Amino acid sequence: MKTEQLMTFLISPEQTIVEAMQKIDANAKGILFITNTDRKLIGAITDGDIRRWLIKTGNLQEQISRLMNRNPKSVYRREVASAQDVMRRYSITALPVLNSKGIVIDILFEQEQKTEVREGSLSLDKVPVVIMAGGKGTRLYPYTKILPKPLIPIGDIPIMERIIDKFRDVGVTDFYATVNYRKNMIKSYFTDTAKDYEIKYVEENQPLGTAGSLRLIEEDFEQPFIVTNCDILIHADYEDIYRYHRESGNELTIVSALKNIVVPYGVIHSSENGAVQSMEEKPKLSYFVNTGMYILNPELKKEIPEDTFYHMTDLTDKLLKENRKVGMYPISEDSFLDMGEFEEMHRMEKKLDLKSE
């Protein structure tokens, strides 16, 4: 591994959670190794460690030294032949290689020929997925004057088909689509495309918001179900998201993404009497935002009012006012792709390494 590539996996203990999330996005392996100024190994941190920390504290500015594993596994250069055995023995996917002075000189990764199901894996083959596909997509005019938003192509594949393909990768076969605007075009496309899954259509007679059409689903779900907007892609472990929802005891789980926003001006901090206390040049603010993907307990469907314009925010507010458990599952900024606007659509194509037509 070249030094430049190696450095994408190394981070200092003083750096923050936000910085670690950005580095993990960049290396796309879900792990970082913490080193001191001499590049000696002192710890490791995974995206799972960060997610658990954020769920517990929500603190993005804490130093990663607070939550790193201080006893990471490693091998010396002379022991490289045993690396795969070490990774299997300890159920880890990455292993740093050290020289005789304890300096990280390489990172080895789990061989990818393994196909067996990991212990603790969770099948989603019986989990219903509801795709909210009834909106007009006004932010994507003039495209959506011709095509409904779910059929807008990202590359050469409609966004809704890409969403379905992501869920098919984890075994989902039970899909529902709430439709309204140009619904016959959507139904025709998926009818004419030979697929190994079924889509049940739920037809709105009027706009019902981001949650109202869930009440129109006649089936009584026996387990928590997934709801997703039709204009987003989430690159995350769907099985882990679902497992977190069940194990945490949430009634509603909101998949949330880190969003870094740079204010394009100098920000003035002042006292109550208008005296300037400090000025910050183009500060970067970090927030967790709603991605538009949720996991709901089945009984919530009946709590949505009939024939009423009702947003998912309305349902969330209702649960919180009743002191019921609503949780979030945090993901990184680059794990959330949104095509709701032209700029974001082109970003999605670039992220997926697709060429815009």
Task: Specify the residue positions occupied by each region the protein language model found.
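Conserved N-terminal catalytic core of the sugar/cofactor nucleotidyltransferase
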Residues: I55, I157-N229, D240, S270, ...
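Catalytic-core segments of class I nucleotidyltransferases/pyrophosphorylases
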Residues: F225-I226, L233, E239-R246, K259-V262, ...
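Short acidic/polar active-site loop segments enriched in Thr and Asp
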Residues: G30, T93, T173, Q223, ...
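Bateman/CBS regulatory modules and CBS-like beta-alpha motifs in cytosolic regions of diverse proteins
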Residues: M1-K23, N27-K29, I34-T37, L41-I42, ...
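Active-site metal-binding loops of divalent metal-dependent hydrolases
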Residues: K136, C230-I232
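A short, conserved acidic/glycine-rich loop-to-beta-strand motif
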Residues: S248-L258
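N-terminal glycine-rich phosphate-binding loop and ensuing alpha1 helix
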Residues: S121-I186
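A short, polar/charged loop-to-alpha-helix boundary motif
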Residues: D49-S65, E112-K126, F288
